[in-house]
Regions:
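Short pre-active-site segment immediately N-terminal to the catalytic Zn-binding motif
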Residues: 69-73, 77, 118-134, 180-187
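Active-site His/Glu-centered metal-binding helix of metallohydrolases
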Residues: 127, 136-145, 191, 195
Length: 384
């Protein structure tokens, strides 16, 4: 987007990111969950069928007729924020935004051909200017990442699942895809939270917005550190029963829990990756075609391995212990059958040392490099 196409620029000095690729802020779990979704049996068939059947024109006409379109004449302050967000993230076409009457605090980016951003009156009335700016940036991040297509399909399939629930086994296949879509969408929220921070460039505003979405407009009664401590307590969880309950609680949700989002975003804001973006060093869109899919897979795998290794959740700890135990057992079996242990005793020192030492020596640095910068927080309001 050229500077001349914007009469409005950010109200205070904010960094702009010309040509930024969504890869710069996408959470590794977002990418890997989308890969898993695309590999799900039947997803491609459903996706292609729905792409031609979904009444997108009807959807646009519905918002046009029953919501307020943001413009210079209506909700001008939101219009300024929207144009600012597109300017900062260099989104060439400003998507239409609508304000819908709804007391629930919510925002979404939907649409198959072109994204549409919708925010509710409940959200507009709840947040101050800088908090709302993070939300608008969050939704523009969804648009830049192309999330609106899958979000639209998720909404449609969720409604369809209710209508066909009476058909034997008719609901099973649909719910399998819906569950996978929800898992991906929860991860995509972490990416969009990061985009919101890049637009607002105010971590405190992002934290305040998330706290308000969780606890309402009583900011004087809330504390960021205490709120983040809740996320830590939630992750630690208690015992394995609590871990299972956490999984069951999150399955029907399209968004991660608010405290988790706040903790993820705060963590990312303190990483070297975030600072590099702010310094102008980030992946660019014109490089996307050259980006290695295998590198993306490795980064995602590294992220999950690091998550299991560092998680305080009892179930994750058990998984890590089992994986670590299996690794130790594998090493012992390898030495047993290759004579690695005996060779060390018998004097074939160089061979044994090279064979056993090299993997051990390279695994550590590789793991550290892989995990660096991939663990990420997130942030921007719950339903945003």
């Amino acid at each position: 987007m050229t500077d001349s196409s914007h009469e409005n620029v950010p109200s205070r000095a904010r960094r702009r990111f010309p040509g930024i690729s969504s890869r710069a802020y996408e959470h590794p779990a977002d990418r890997s969950a989308l890969v898993a979704l695309r590999r799900l049996t039947g997803f491609d068939t459903v996706f292609k069928a729905l792409s031609g059947l979904l009444p997108e024109r009807s959807l646009r006409l519905l918002f046009l007729s029953d919501s307020v379109r943001v413009s210079e004449a209506q909700f001008a302050h939101l219009n300024d924020m929207l144009r600012d967000a597109c300017y900062i993230l260099d989104l060439e076409k400003v998507p239409p935004m609508y304000v819908k009457q709804d007391p629930q605090s919510n925002a979404m980016c939907i649409g198959l051909d072109e994204p549409i951003i919708v925010v509710t009156t409940g959200l507009v009335e709840l947040l101050d200017e800088e908090e709302m700016r993070a939300v608008v940036g969050h939704e523009v991040g969804h648009a830049l990442s192309g999330h609106s297509v899958y979000r639209t399909i998720l909404l449609f399939l969720t409604n369809l699942a209710v209508k066909v629930a009476w058909i034997p086994l008719g609901n099973v296949a649909i719910m399998a895809i819906v569950t996978a879509l929800r898992e991906w969408f929860r991860k995509s929220e972490l990416s969009a939270d990061r985009a919101g921070l890049l637009v607002g460039q105010d971590i405190q505003a992002s934290m305040r917005g998330l706290m308000k979405i969780a606890g309402g407009n009583h900011l004087h009664e809330m504390n960021v550190d205490a709120f983040l401590a809740q996320a830590d307590e939630y992750e630690k969880g208690g015992d394995l029963r609590d871990s299972v309950l956490k999984i069951m609680n999150v399955l029907p949700r399209t968004h991660p829990f608010t405290t988790v989002r706040a903790a993820e975003l705060k963590k990312w804001s303190e990483t070297r990756d975030f600072q590099r973006i702010m310094d102008g060093h980030y992946p660019r869109r014109d490089e996307d075609k050259d980006a290695s899919v295998s590198d993306s897979f490795r980064e995602s795998a590294s992220h999950y391995a690091d998550t299991v290794r560092t998680s305080k959740d009892p179930l994750m700890k058990l998984v890590g212990d089992i994986a670590g135990g299996a690794g130790d057992l594998g090493g012992k079996l390898r030495d047993k059958f290759t004579g690695g242990g005996g060779a060390a005793k018998g004097g074939a020192g160089p061979t044994a040392t090279d064979g056993g030492g090299t993997p051990g020596g390279t695994a550590g640095p590789e793991g550290a490099a892989g995990s660096e910068g991939t663990e990420g927080p997130e942030e921007g309001p719950r339903k945003a």
